[in-house]
Amino acid sequence: MWIRECRKEMGFMNGLIYFFLPGCPFCRQAQEYWAELEREEPKYAGIQAVKINEREQADLADRFDYWLVPCFFLNGRKLHEGAADKAQIRAVLDQALSELL
């Protein structure tokens, strides 16, 4: 029920959503891995994500069930939460590719 209500309010719910905090070293590292993967494998460059700064958009972030950043949701379900290595970011991007493109 909650996801359905959010989908009505937030049309972007069906996609990749990335929650982050400025200054978070784990978020910065995740973004660096993402950029590296885009350079290494151009297929990742086509992935669009809604990026939500949880400090500036706290009202929106509070609607999602997570505690740690970086955090990735895909089509309403959590894919990854917390510090991530390059392989974990690749797994998020691969899942997004398989479901979105």
Where are these regions (language model features)?
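Local sequence-structure signature of Cys/Sec-based thiol-disulfide redox active-site neighborhoods
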Residues: C6, M10-E40
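Non-catalytic, surface beta->alpha helical segment in thiol-disulfide oxidoreductase systems
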Residues: F73-L101
